[in-house]
């Protein structure tokens, strides 16, 4: 399921009167087969796009919850190539965006790994530690393979950098809702909502917000502020950690996804009524 499909997914969500929901899983946590079944549970709960994390030994952008999942996946021997096998299965029923680090791509060869990702049906890629100024090679290879490169916009992003991102962006832009690393939190600052509005005014592709989005009202607020989608990771991983077995984990993430989708619907309704 590739070929620049991500923007269409956002359009379909809007057509249903809601923002899109992007769910994150760490590949190989708690196992490769379990990752596929959890992805299916997320899809059944209403997740529109799966962000599949490729385990890396130094996940500098990840908070403690996801770092724990990454460590467990690495100890189990999960490789970047295993992740493509999982992506191939998952992309049969939900679009897949890979989340990886620059060293992973470099060590496996940009063209070699991205070509295999395209063959596996991967729709997009997020390189967590790759600024737009250093993205020429990855962007060129991915564009030729019809894989969207998803760029990150942080509170510290300058007007000049956002302009460059706007020129290159496809699929969607990932807005980092705060400084620091990923992780669930209870508050959502007005600065985040202003950041969403600022980015929305400067790019022509969908805008999705992540980092700390964990509750229904978080999703509602960012969609109401103008975001086209919300990205939820740590909250799903926590539900997996709380579970006694994979069946319970599937049920927990499915039910959480359903709740978050309702937040995306409420946020879209609020935004539409104020326009």
Curated annotation (Swiss-Prot):
GO cellular component, one term: cytosol
Pfam families: Trp_syntA
Active site: 51 (proton acceptor), 62 (proton acceptor)
Keywords annotated in UniProt: Amino-acid biosynthesis, Aromatic amino acid biosynthesis, Lyase, Tryptophan biosynthesis
Alphabetical list of InterPro entries matching this protein: Aldolase_TIM, RibuloseP-bd_barrel, Trp_synthase_alpha_AS, Trp_synthase_suA
EC number: 4.2.1.20
Enzyme class: lyase
Pathway per the UniProt entry: Amino-acid biosynthesis; L-tryptophan biosynthesis; L-tryptophan from chorismate: step 5/5
Catalytic reactions of this protein: (1S,2R)-1-C-(indol-3-yl)glycerol 3-phosphate + L-serine = D-glyceraldehyde 3-phosphate + L-tryptophan + H2O
SUPFAM superfamilies, alphabetized: Ribulose-phoshate binding barrel
Domain of life: Archaea
An example Gene Ontology molecular-function term: tryptophan synthase activity
Task of the protein: The alpha subunit is responsible for the aldol cleavage of indoleglycerol phosphate to indole and glyceraldehyde 3-phosphate.
Record family assignment: Belongs to the TrpA family.
Oligomer and partners: Tetramer of two alpha and two beta chains.
Name recorded for this polypeptide: Tryptophan synthase alpha chain
Originating organism: Methanopyrus kandleri (strain AV19 / DSM 6324 / JCM 9639 / NBRC 100938)
